């Protein structure tokens, strides 16, 4: 995903261009929409302007992997809430129970459960240690639904994630398929659905 973000920036992608491309999306799409991106481009755009434009465009939430929870609480939470934009925080197997409960208390939308502290990418299945982590978080009875991401690329990983959470987040596999299909989103989406079924 990081490679895709770098390539997009090299090809001239900007937040302004993204919002221009999304301006009419709510005429066709009714499901919740969540953007994912790094903090630096958002700061260059202006955090308040970014949140306002998200609201105006119909974006429901934003995942900012490099936004520390402390900074979110101290500097960005009130701005996001004022614009009714949910900031989705990530947790990992190493995140303390205390931090997880704080994230659950002070955010809305869902909690992004990173399946491992390793980089994103395909895995054949989740080992017993990862499944124990998923169960440990489920047993916390959090207020927010949980979504599991990182390494979901086939039926096994998708079903395991879905059994332990409200759903799965699939990024790297889709980016890989987009590359294979020369940017044809329909073909890439069809191949992704096929991979998750078989």
In which residue ranges do the predicted regions lie?
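Glycine-enriched alpha-helix->loop->beta-strand junction motifs that scaffold or abut catalytic
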Residues: 54-60, 80-87, 105-111, 163-168
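Alpha-helix-loop-beta-strand connector modules within alpha/beta enzyme cores
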Residues: 1-34, 78-92, 128-146, 152, ...
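Glycine/proline-rich, positively charged
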Residues: 35-66
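Hydrophobic faces of well-ordered beta-strands that scaffold small-molecule active sites
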Residues: 33-37, 62-64, 87-91, 111-113, ...
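Histidine/lysine/aspartate-rich catalytic loop segments that bind and position anionic ligands
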Residues: 85-121
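Glycine-rich phosphate-binding active-site loops on the catalytic face of alpha/beta enzymes
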Residues: 57-71, 112-122, 164-184
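Active-site-adjacent beta->alpha loops and helix N-cap segments on the catalytic face
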Residues: 10-25, 43-48, 66-82, 96-101, ...
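Catalytic cores of alpha/beta
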Residues: 95-106, 141, 152-168
């Amino acid at each position: 995903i990081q490679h895709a973000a770098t390539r997009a920036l090299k090809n001239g992608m900007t937040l302004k261009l993204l919002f221009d491309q999304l301006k009419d999306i709510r005429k066709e799409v009714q499901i919740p929409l969540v953007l994912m991106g790094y903090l630096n481009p958002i700061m260059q755009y202006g955090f308040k302007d970014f949140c306002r434009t998200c609201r105006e465009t119909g974006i429901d939430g934003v995942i900012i992997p490099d936004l520390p929870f402390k900074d979110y609480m101290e500097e960005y939470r009130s701005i996001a809430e004022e614009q009714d934009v949910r900031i989705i925080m990530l947790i990992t197997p190493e995140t303390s129970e205390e931090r997880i409960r704080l994230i659950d208390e002070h955010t809305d939308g869902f909690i992004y459960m990173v399946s491992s502290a390793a980089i994103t990418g395909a895995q054949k299945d989740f080992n017993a240690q990862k499944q124990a982590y998923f169960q440990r978080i489920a047993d916390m009875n959090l207020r927010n639904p949980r979504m599991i991401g990182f390494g979901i690329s086939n039926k096994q990983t998708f079903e395991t994630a879905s059994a332990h959470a409200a759903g799965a987040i699939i990024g790297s596999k889709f980016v890989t398929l987009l590359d294979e299909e020369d940017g044809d989103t329909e073909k890439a989406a069809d191949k992704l659905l096929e991979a998750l079924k078989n």
